[in-house]
Regions:
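Conserved class I S-adenosyl-L-methionine
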Residues: 1-40, 43-51, 58
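Class I SAM-dependent methyltransferase SAM/SAH-binding core
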Residues: 52-102
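A short acidic, Gly/Pro-enriched loop at the edge of an enzyme's catalytic core
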Residues: 101, 105-112
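A short SAM/SAH-binding and catalytic strip from SAM-dependent methyltransferases
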Residues: 112-127
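A short glycine-rich, Lys/Arg-flanked "PGG" loop and its adjoining helix->strand segment in the class I
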Residues: 130-142
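SAM-dependent methyltransferase
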Residues: 143-198, 206-215
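Core SAM-dependent methyltransferase catalytic element
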Residues: 219-236
Length: 236
């Protein structure tokens, strides 16, 4: 039976896992470093795939005052609202249900956008990733910056895995793997591949370091996320 790439994100147990991470893990040191380098606290920020509210909570607690956190999953939206409201009731209104591939905001609505922890790579096909990139590009202001991460299949443990494994659907980098709840789909890209998709959708890469090249993330972050590659791209 064909597996549904969205099913994992619609489950209560998955949402609870990410809600706990919002409180226990928080913003990574590597994320914070890039946020401080490329974002300012007075900018309007769009978060895609907010999950349980980890990044949104960290941004709001750090003084970023205009944050819109979104997720396509109703249960994720519900729990993210609860997590934020537990800290400040006014923050509950910062969370909205949106599909990253078909954002409904007006053109040039945001100064910055972030799609944390490989969320873009959990979209099921290249066509979906390109649709999301075009949608994000549309709602960013001219010169706006998009920050996201992508699992790199040429580095670290990913490289060792892909040296001996075949892709699950004959597309290099596509993989279903077990989680604490249900199987989850993720695409592990190469740097050249992701740079190409960004160029195709109107973005220029500013930098794309591995998380370990930015900062020493703590043990909770390493357990939660492992190694990943950050991309910082500007709307051309």
């Amino acid at each position: 039976m064909e597996r549904d790439p969205q099913a994992h994100w619609l489950e209560t147990e998955t949402a609870l896992h990410y809600a706990r991470a919002a409180v226990r893990v928080g913003i990574w040191a590597s994320e914070r470093s890039l946020l401080e380098r490329h974002f300012t606290k007075d900018q309007r920020i769009l978060e895609l795939g907010c999950g349980g509210g980890r990044v949104a909570l960290g941004l709001l607690q750090s003084g970023y005052s205009d944050v819109v956190a979104t997720d396509f999953s109703p249960i994720m939206v519900s729990l993210a609202r609860a997590v934020l409201a537990d800290h400040d009731e006014a923050w509950e209104k910062c969370v909205e249900q949106q599909d990253a591939t078909t954002l409904t905001y007006p053109e040039a609505s945001f100064d910055r956008a972030i799609f944390a922890f490989n969320g873009l790579m959990c979209l099921p096909t290249k066509a979906h990733r390109l649709a999301a990139l075009r949608s994000i590009h549309r709602v960013l202001k001219p010169g706006g910056v998009f920050l996201f991460t992508a699992s790199d299949r040429e580095k670290g443990a990913n490289a060792a895995y892909w040296a001996k494994e075949e892709p699950d659907d004959e597309i290099p980098g596509d993989r279903w793997h077990e989680s604490d709840t249900s199987p989850v789909f993720i695409h592990s890209s190469t740097e050249a591949e992701t740079r190409g998709e960004l160029s195709e959708t109107g973005f220029t890469v500013i930098e794309c370091p591995l998380s370990s090249e930015i900062a020493a993330d703590g043990p909770l972050v390493r357990q939660f996320a492992g190694e990943t590659r950050f991309y910082v791209a500007r709307k051309s």
